Amino acid sequence: MTKMNNPKFTTPSGDTAPRQVWQQTVDAVLAQTKSQAAGLSSADAAERLNTCGPNALPEKKGKPGWLRFLAHFNDVLIYVLLAAAALTAIMGHWVDTLVILGVTVINALIGHIQESNAEKSLQGIRNMLSSDARVQRNGKHETIPTRDLVPGDIVILRAGDRVPADMRLIETHNLRVEEAILTGESTVVDKITDALEGDLPLGDRVNMVFSGTTVSASGGVGVVTATGAQTELGHINQMMAGIEKHRTPLLVQMDKLGKAIFAIILAMMVALFIFSLALRDIPMGELLLSLISLAVAAVPEGLPAIISIILSLGVQTMARKRAIIRKLPTVETLGAMTVVCSDKTGTLTMNEMTVKAIITADCCYRVEGDSYEPQGRIFLEGSDEPVQVQPGTVLETWLRTIDLCNDSQLTQDERGLWGITGGPTEGALKVLAAKAQLPAVEARLVAKIPFDSQYKYMSTLQHIDGNARVLITGAPDVIFAMCREQMSRHGAVPFEAQYWEEEMARFARQGLRMVAAACKPASLDATTLNHEDLQEGLIFLGIAGMMDPPRPEAIDAIHACQTAGIRVKMITGDHPQTAMSIGQMLGITNSSQAMTGYQLEHMDDAALAKAAVEYDIFARTSPEHKLRLVKALQDNGEVVGMTGDGVNDAPALRQADVGIAMGIKGTEVTKEAADMVLTDDNFATIASSVKEGRRVYDNLKKTILFIMPTNLAQGLLIIIALLAGNIIPLTPVLILWMNMATSATLSFGLAFEAAERNVMNRPPRKTGQHVMDGFAVWRVAFVGSMIAIAAFILEAWLAPRGHSPEFIRTVLLQMLVTAQWVYMINCRSSDSFSLSMGLLRNKGIWLVTGVLLLMQLVIIYVPLMQSMFGTEALPLRYWFVTLVIGVAMFLVVEIEKRLTRRFRKTA
């Protein structure tokens, strides 16, 4: 089907340069869309629907569940196990076959359960479209399915409606729209119909409304300019569909480790097969069983399950700290994060507009307090003595004006938490008046002019203690034009525009937004109030400077992140000056300069890559800008975390290595696209999550260092046995018992290790740094060889004493499990003495020790388990022998740690 071009980007005939619909007059837009105020005819609408397609977002069919499950068998180490299972089946060793196949299925199930269904986030966007729309067709009002809307339709909007398509407004009646899902800014937007100038970001296109946003007050009429995939919401949907999530550092490292193990296994098996055929007269069945045992021994089958256990414990810990992890590997990725890109409103700030400064004709004041709680004093600027508000003063008159000319109310819930009803600006003024504790007066509202986006002020006629007064609050530039006088301590004096403009500029540099107030006396006989009544006689009183203040805990959290080598970047839809001011208060490193979305729009990829590193404040940004910034940082080798709450943030969250959604004000779309959800919308939670992520990575590394020597020792034992012509020391099922049962159980103890003291004072690990670094390889080789040599000596001591192969294998099993247990304690620290680290405080170690002892008693002494695993009951003295060997190994490893500590620190 041929699609109509997006009308927002077409050029009317005769224009010499493309003009966007927000830059055109209402008549020009109607002409461009070939529409009229009376609406389209049914025939014209049907033709356009056939040409443009339905007003719906395209759906992409996801992979079926069974195919996603099978994808988890696509791993080189799983191939080794499947081949081993096939060979044991051919040889008739059905117990071995079933156990090996069971291991592969368990690993696949774990991976399948972890896998997130990314299509949910796209479905969430589709669910944001309204179901019906009121339109003007055939000269009359009709209600039609939203899917049937076409460019050129005239749509009627009312309070509470969800906007069904992108529209250019042709008529407004104090229309206010909530656009936070697209812009990220929580304040409602007052809409107009006038044409606008310039290449404006979405948040400044105040003569348009966008699909998925909500009408919060009054109503209006608009002409549809884009539907379906051509809308701003559709554009976000397309970006989401085109993003492929990066693999986490942990998964990349595990892939590399798996391929390295596979290469070693293959080389060893081929070499041993050739050697045994050429130099040893070993029956083919026994040789194949030995090689299968070698393959099973070398594969760390329990590692995926163990990693999942450790990550799951991290998830539970983070949940208690108000961070919900949606995808397990995110826990580890948090520890590798090098950059956090954060939204401003509500995440770094309190999302509670607060008055911080007062400007009057005589002086300026600063105001305490950072929330809606009416606690805080007023100070004369430069003084530490609080001001007592005296009746009849300029300050008292100004405070009384902002209190009475106000539609908001201060509220307190059953928990004692303070809030407001009404808009945030009026709420901030109401809170300030409450802080001042003004003496009670008898006030009665006589008439009111509600706030209107066209006039940019509201006004009331009040009777206050028997006097009539007109009060007005609004935009300073508008009220300036109405005033010829200003109130000072000497009474009414001529208005001094230069003074007010200079003071406003000074406070604007601090990121404050301005609201002005004025008043004039009125007649007690007056019962109405209109705009003409405000054109003369107003006396200017003063200006409130307000801001959404930083969260106190966010300041500490940013400092903690920067100490940990994580750079914090603020990406916001707010104005640059406000963003820089908040950035300086928060302590963001480079907050003296800001990059705007307009500047980003005109950068090529090379310039953007440089700007992404150089700047820490990005203002007036769009979804595309956020997405490009994340990609640019990733191309520079950064591991990027990105916060967001609106639909506009979803593409960047999905692209980021760690997408972080807000749980309170975040949309469902954003939460589905994210890897982590903050239940308190607090940046400080990110810092604590980074600490937990680093702890988890440390414990994962300890676990891998714990598991690998056992696999190496098992493999070396089998190789030595083949070379020496001895019995197979370990059968595949015994190897799987150690790799899946005992290793997993003991690893659980390491999962409970607390974070090391310097965990947030070290830089993030380098991108691409492998978990198996040089010292890790040395430790695995040293410990694995030591265990193998000890087991070989033990086997050589047992063999001449006439014991059965099953008895010898049982003693070797117990010796290897004991070695695992003592080495698990060694692994608590890579260089410190393990018994000096609060062994009694880690209850997990004692729990797994008890479970391990029970498991070994069952496999050695229960007849059913003896027949399944080929074990025999052991006399008590052999438990003592294996324990002595284990203690000796523990001491050797502790000595090795002491000797190599100096080399590790200088490496």
Question: Model-predicted segments: where are they?
Answer:
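C-terminal substrate-binding/catalytic lobe of Rossmann-fold NAD(P)-dependent dehydrogenases
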Residues: 794-797, 801, 805, 817
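A C-terminal functional module that forms or caps the active site or interfaces directly
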Residues: 827
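Loop-to-helix transition at the N-terminal end of transmembrane alpha-helices
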Residues: 734-738, 806-815
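Conserved cytosolic headpiece of P-type ATPases
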Residues: 1-761, 771-772, 785, 796, ...
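Membrane-water interface at loop-to-transmembrane-helix junctions
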Residues: 766-785, 805-811
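Generic alpha-helical transmembrane segments
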Residues: 742, 787-788, 810-824
